[in-house]
Amino acid sequence: MKKFLITLLLGVFMGLQASALTHQEINQAKVPVIYEENHLLPMGFIHLAFRGGGSLSDKNQLGLAKLFAQVLNEGTKELGAVGFAQLLEQKAISLNVDTSTEDLQITLEFLKEYEDEAITRLKELLKSPNFTQNALEKVKTQMLAALLQKESDFDYLAKLTLKQELFANTPLANAALGTKESIQKIKLDDLKQQFAKVFELNKLVVVLGGDLKIDQTLKRLNNALNFLPQGKAYEEPYFETSDKKSEKVLYKDTEQAFVYFGAPFKIKDLKQDLAKSKVMMFVLGGGFGSRLMEKIRVQEGLAYSVYIRSNFSKVAHFASGYLQTKLSTQTKSVALVKKIVKEFIEKGMTQQELDDAKKFLLGSEPLRNETISSRLNTTYNYFYLGLPLNFNQTLLNQIQKMSLKEINDFIKAHTEINDLTFAIVSNKKKDK
């Protein structure tokens, strides 16, 4: 799963209270709730993640999940987009609906004094969404305009092409925005069917944070959501990453080459190997001082930035990277990426590289979890991956104790990273 963003920052002090997990029964469904109370500021947020409500489930209606979420942002049928937005703004309430690859996500942010009203607005939206022809046509127009803009977004095109090469003939190869043809075919009945499919309580995960009394907040949520059916739990499909080492080039009117690349990264046990994968990818291509950055940018001057990172979700495990270079150095840059990765897999890293990686990761990881929003984001991600909620401390301990032999044995065991696929946006007339 891709991870959700909670924008509300409710404090910069660490460790005031660890995030915790409980369950709330709503209409006889046992809904997991991740929460953390923090009373520094009189603010709160509620995040609802409906598993299976993302673009992965679009099937032959590409763009439906995204369009559905955007129509939900058009307010209620009674008030419309403007009237509903004004009602929220009067009390400084923020209510936003979005999708990721796997989930539909509703984020509600509010001042403590308006918590009850915020949850009431949420209930009104779900009870009577603005499923009207006017709202549908408005969102269709917005999405078609976005698709038109994407035609000249070379990063988007290269990234989408890489997905299509790595996950050919699977839902992961599809564009979340859909196509012009698929968007135009979506009807009001499709939105109503999507609502019934997505909003089931057994697919729901709740995240709460801020100046809340959790028991009271959950009672209010129960009242807002208990009209939804139990439904069935979401079962994630898993997709293998291509190891065909293909190279796909799209020719456009561009002055630069946009190079995206990826490969399988077969991790069987995240609890044992997540720390090693973090160290491995940091040294290979995680920033300044990494192998890719030092050789491609510093020594060769071929790109301003280059990286590679791991991507672990319940639906796929793979590594992916990116660089942008001159058209004249495109071929050389691609060859150099292959060479650097191959040498790294064969020989591993040095003790100095391991020490530097430990210093950076052990110093930066705690900073990434110093706000309540970032802590809950991390906790939700661990919950999603099936890891303990407090896995962050385990991760830091594993990094601290990691030996050079341990990390190099791990690196040398993952020869599949050599099976790189490239997706490139270039210019046929100028790439020589």
From Swiss-Prot:
State the signal peptide span: 1-20
- UniProt-listed Pfam families: Peptidase_M16, Peptidase_M16_C
Localized where?
Secreted
UniProt keywords (A-Z) are: Secreted, Signal
Q: Which InterPro entries match?
A: Metalloenz_LuxS/M16, MPP/UQCRC_Complex, Pept_M16_N, Peptidase_M16_C
Keyword Signal among UniProt keywords: yes
Quote a single Gene Ontology cellular component term: extracellular region
Gene Ontology molecular function terms on file: metal ion binding
Q: What is the similarity comment for this entry?
A: Belongs to the peptidase M16 family.
**Known function:** May contribute to the full activity of the protease PqqE.
For this entry, the protein name equals Non-peptidase homolog YmxG
